[in-house]
Curated annotation (Swiss-Prot):
GO terms for biological process: translation. Part of the 50S ribosomal subunit. Keywords: Chloroplast, Plastid, Ribonucleoprotein, Ribosomal protein, RNA-binding, rRNA-binding. The keyword RNA-binding applies. One of its GO terms (molecular function) is rRNA binding. Belongs to the universal ribosomal protein uL23 family. It is found in: Plastid, Chloroplast. PROSITE patterns: RIBOSOMAL_L23. This is Large ribosomal subunit protein uL23cz/uL23cy. GO terms for cellular component: chloroplast; ribonucleoprotein complex; ribosome. Its main location: plastid. InterPro entries: Nucleotide-bd_a/b_plait_sf, Ribosomal_uL23-like, Ribosomal_uL23/eL15/eS24_sf, Ribosomal_uL23_CS. Binds to 23S rRNA.
């Protein structure tokens, strides 16, 4: 799992879950085809489309943080990605 870092939960990403679209941050060097292949292989789903944009790194007092890419992955109807962490009761 070199490509995908973690899932993103913002107001927009939660709204997009209703359209069967999932948002996650990925490594900046990974390509769309690598991410698509990994998602289809690991989760067993079919990907229709992928949108991506690069987010800038943040400046620090000394140095900076690396930039990263955010992918919005659209799945075919009938497929979904299950939550990776179960809620504790």
């Amino acid at each position: 799992m070199d490509g995908i870092k973690y899932a993103v939960f913002t107001e927009k990403s939660i709204r997009l879950l209703g359209n069967n679209q999932y948002t996650s941050n990925v490594e900046s060097g990974s390509t769309r085809t690598e991410i698509k292949h990994w998602v289809e292989l690991f989760f067993g789903v079919k990907v229709i489309a992928m949108n991506s944009h690069r987010l800038p790194g943040k400046g620090r007092r000394m140095g900076h943080t690396m930039h990263y890419r955010r992918m919005i992955i659209t799945l075919q109807p009938g497929y979904s990605i299950p939550p990776l962490i179960e809620k504790r009761t």
